[in-house]
Amino acid sequence: MSRRCELTAKGAQVGHKVSHSNIKTKRRFLPNLVNITFISDALGRQVRLRVSTNALKSVDHRGGLDGFLLKAKDAELSPKAVDIKRQIEKKKLTAELAAQA
């Protein structure tokens, strides 16, 4: 499992640990990743993803997983998240066609 957020593609960064005597040592800054289960309103089921806490805040801001995925770019999403996005788009399209008929 990679240390990368499945929604925002946030990953590890490299920087320096600086001591009191100003000696710089390479270190990695890892993202704060959590395993969380989202509920998709469109799909009517639970979706388990590994996301950063920053992405979790963004999902809440956009009104849930469905709203976040529909506005997100495919390049930033993991293959699993892109698949979920396609399922949501398909479900919404069929719901709109059923409402018109």
From Swiss-Prot:
Q: Which domain of life is it from?
A: Bacteria
* Cellular component terms per the entry's GO annotation: cytosolic large ribosomal subunit
Write down the Pfam families for this protein, in alphabetical order: Ribosomal_L28
- By its UniProt entry, which Gene3D superfamilies does this protein fall under? Ribosomal protein L28/L24
MF terms from GO for this chain are:
structural constituent of ribosome
Alphabetically list the UniProt keywords. Answer: Ribonucleoprotein, Ribosomal protein
Concerning SUPFAM superfamilies, the annotation shows: L28p-like
Task: Write out the GO biological process terms.
Answer: translation
**UniProt record similarity statement:** Belongs to the bacterial ribosomal protein bL28 family.
Q: What is this protein called?
A: Large ribosomal subunit protein bL28
Recorded source organism is Rhodopseudomonas palustris (strain BisA53)
